[in-house]
Amino acid sequence: MPFTLGQRWISDTESELGLGTIVAMDARTVTLLFPSTGENRLYARSDSPVTRVMFNPGDTITSHEGWQLHIDEVKEENGLLVYVGTRLDTEETNVTLREVLLDSKLVFSKPQDRLFAGQIDRMDRFALRYRARKFQSEQYRMPYSGLRGQRTNLIPHQLNIAHDVGRRHAPRVLLADEVGLGKTIEAGMILHQQLLSGAAERVLIIVPETLQHQWLVEMLRRFNLRFALFDDERYTEAQHDAYNPFETEQLVICSLDFARRNKQRLEHLCDAEWDLLVVDEAHHLVWSTDAPSREYMAIEQLAERVPGVLLLTATPEQLGMESHFARLRLLDPNRFHDFEQFVEEQKNYRPVADAVAMLLAGNKLSNDELNRLGDLIGEQDIEPLLQAANSDRDDAQAARDELVSMLMDRHGTSRVLFRNTRNGVKGFPKRELHTVKLPLPTQYQTAIKVSGIMGARKSAEDRARDMLYPEQIYQEFEGDTGTWWNFDPRVEWLMGYLTSHRSQKVLVICAKATTALQLEQVLREREGIRAAVFHEGMSIIERDRAAAWFAEEDTGAQVLLCSEIGSEGRNFQFASNLVMFDLPFNPDLLEQRIGRLDRIGQAHDIQIHVPYLEKTAQSVLVRWYHEGLDAFEHTCPTGRAIYDSAYASLINYLAAPEETDGFDDLIKSCREQHEALKAQLEQGRDRLLEIHSNGGEKAQQLAQSIEEQDDDTNLIAFAMNLFDIVGINQDDRGDNLIVLTPSDHMLVPDFPGLPEDGCTITFERDVALSREDAQFITWEHPLIRNGLDLILSGDTGSSTISLLKNKALPVGTLLVELVYVVEAQAPKQLQLNRFLPPTPVRMLLDKNGNNLAAQVEFETFNRQLSAVNRHTGSKLVNAVQQDVHAILQLGETQIEKSARALIDNARREADEKLSGELSRLEALRAVNPNIRDDELAAIDSNRQQVLESLNQAGWRLDALRLIVVTHQ
């Protein structure tokens, strides 16, 4: 193309310079000035890497003065283009704009503009963009969005609760599973779904102080949710950044004590407009009709202001009826306002539970039983269902299941309370106790005597704590010169046990971090035993590395030495040997220790070893735990209640272990109390609630469906393709582990979610569960979601040129591959992507407008194409620009029909689903008062807004590829 002074061109290699103007030329060179940067470039005339910028009728352009022109006609005068059209700000027609007066800061965002301006992407980036659109659209439509990405075992009862609650508007529920069944994971799954769908954006978690780091770790490691931990120091710092410090973070964890201690702080918490509030250990909130505690009132204030509330608590039977009512009152004070009425109501659910038990038993029902069912579900004609359920027909079981479902809907608190028990959930191992009685060394005997004399004025509790850890007493007297590990028989026993079980992983827990550190040194120096240490003084990353080393099968640590606090929230199901080097002070901590191994997913029976020193508090406590509470070999829901009632007597025996008179009677009394309470709890079990919480067959199918999605080969191929194109280094470490590190030539300087020093990833759930340092990559992982956003929010891969070698077609034949996106704009909380996610529509048009996309599949076609360098590509585009423009206009005509069909289908699906959900809940409200008015109103409002947003849905061209046929 001939050059003329004043023409506008763009650099193929430096598009960031903007629009250039020819300011000088001679026989061999041409000089361009780029006004937006003030730079000049000198190019050879014969083969310069520049592209002429030419706009077409229908385009909108901007003048150097800032006003815009809609082009109606393009003229050429002396080699320069003159654009004629309508000025948008004044609506004046027949306005002319010479190309020399175009805005130099021109940004080409439309794919066709980028193509015509020579901004041509690599072919592999176009393919990645199309795949990203396709996979993103598919993922939005997947039925279990938000449940697939967490690093957890796929446990049916947990998935059932999370799936039910996570899809609700502003859920307000009580999670009351027995210990070890995963309430924290259930809460995390619910949060993950709500945050991923946009139903919630701001979350506050309030927990006891000792559990803050456990929650921080669990949310980050299992769900990739990065919470901020607020304490006094962080709160004071944040006051410099905002009037309300809590508005500086979206996801916050704080302790209950921190929340209630300061009136202004509580007001700030209440004013921070949270979407979800999570309260752990909610059974510690003391309430009575006359005198609710300050902690209870603080949470009550928050629960009144926050739409969604999750309370995690001990089982209702452990709490007692009044305490249980107090939790429900926090969730829905209008519904649960009268304790006496609540007690009466609970009694009335007994016939419902009995009816469900009859149906589940599978026996034929008597006339009386059929009549009772008819009375319980009186507002509907269920005669045909009753007949089917009581027959030998093939549909008998289906009829029974439907009747059970109808009865469940009428069950008082089943929508607000979820509770699973170990009896109702299979898959737990046995626990076997091995006690090892060891002599008390003379050094300890001396230290204890001296301590007794010096600490005569200490309280019984302080003396008891001292007596539990004699090594601490000895070390205090001896100082740095003390070496208790040289004579403590527990150390010798531990070394002997570990050397005789070299092939087995062993978890050792002791109360103090210093004990763990000293034991590690002794094991390493004396026996060369590989031991990892895990304590509260380590950072989360250091703990991860220690846990990962322990998890490695062949070259990993044989033993992990944990302190009491350091082990909180970490589970090591791959090990089944637990050594308690000392004993914790109360049964809750004992259960927490055993719970590190005793989880769902543990494949072996747990061997619990307790080496203890005679004539110390350890010998007293080991007997009380085992003989009085049976707390080693079985979970002990009665432990806290009995501990509280026996506390005064127990403390005295611990403080003076040599005084054994009456101790056998105490053990006997505690055992009787334990058996009585246990029987009482068993009798009070709410079978109906367990069935509802457990999910049964439906929950099993849910787990199976997600497990099948784990094996998605498309994800692995896409992720590796994404990392290649973004410029992330990948180092395969074997064992299904890959190390990702940033490179110097990435698409963006900082890839969101990729640490500076890199990270280890795996696509295998089992590997991720055993290797805490490896991130579990799914479609829901931030690395993949951020990668999709990075590609799709910019113009990466939106315009390219390829060659098709095909002798069946004439040389120079043109094809244009168009990728349109049909989408609707709406606030995230409407979750419009359930019905109409940004959906790609691919078209492959020839010169006559024939769409060949249905006959030519994308991946097959892509493999037949070869790339063109940018300079050659620009020349090709210039040569066929008019033809391409004509094909684009044909595409604009054809897309409307396909797009309208997608939008109409989405509207129909949304209307059916949301109207059906509303109708079901409205009908249910007649028989179950636990359906809240605000929930019904929210669903109705959501339905109207969704349909309105879908009415305004549209489409746009997202990417295009020009294909030229060649025979070479």
Swiss-Prot record:
Q: Which UniProt keywords apply?
A: Activator, ATP-binding, DNA-binding, Helicase, Hydrolase, Nucleotide-binding, Transcription, Transcription regulation
Q: How does it assemble?
A: Interacts with the RNAP. Has a higher affinity for the core RNAP than for the holoenzyme. Its ATPase activity is stimulated by binding to RNAP.
| Domain Helicase C-terminal: residue ranges | 490-685
**DEAH box, short sequence motif: residues:** 280-283
Q: What NCBIfam families is this protein classified in?
A: PRK04914.1 (NF003426)
Q: Which InterPro entries match?
A: Helicase_ATP-bd, Helicase_C-like, Helicase_RapA, P-loop_NTPase, RapA_C, SNF2-like_sf, SNF2/RAD54-like_C, SNF2_N
- What are the EC numbers? 3.6.4.-
Binding-site list for ATP: 177-184
Q: Name one GO biological process term.
A: regulation of DNA-templated transcription
UniProt function note: Transcription regulator that activates transcription by stimulating RNA polymerase (RNAP) recycling in case of stress conditions such as supercoiled DNA or high salt concentrations. Probably acts by releasing the RNAP, when it is trapped or immobilized on tightly supercoiled DNA. Does not activate transcription on linear DNA. Probably not involved in DNA repair.
Q: Which PANTHER family match?
A: DNA ANNEALING HELICASE AND ENDONUCLEASE ZRANB3 FAMILY MEMBER, SWI_SNF-RELATED MATRIX-ASSOCIATED ACTIN-DEPENDENT REGULATOR OF CHROMATIN SUBFAMILY A-LIKE PROTEIN 1
Q: Does the keyword section mention Translocase?
A: no
* Start and end residues of each Helicase ATP-binding domain: 164-334
Q: Write out the GO MF terms.
A: ATP binding; DNA binding; helicase activity; hydrolase activity, acting on acid anhydrides
Gene name, please? rapA
Q: Which residues cross the membrane?
A: none
Family as reported in the entry's similarity comment? Belongs to the SNF2/RAD54 helicase family. RapA subfamily.
Recorded protein name is: RNA polymerase-associated protein RapA
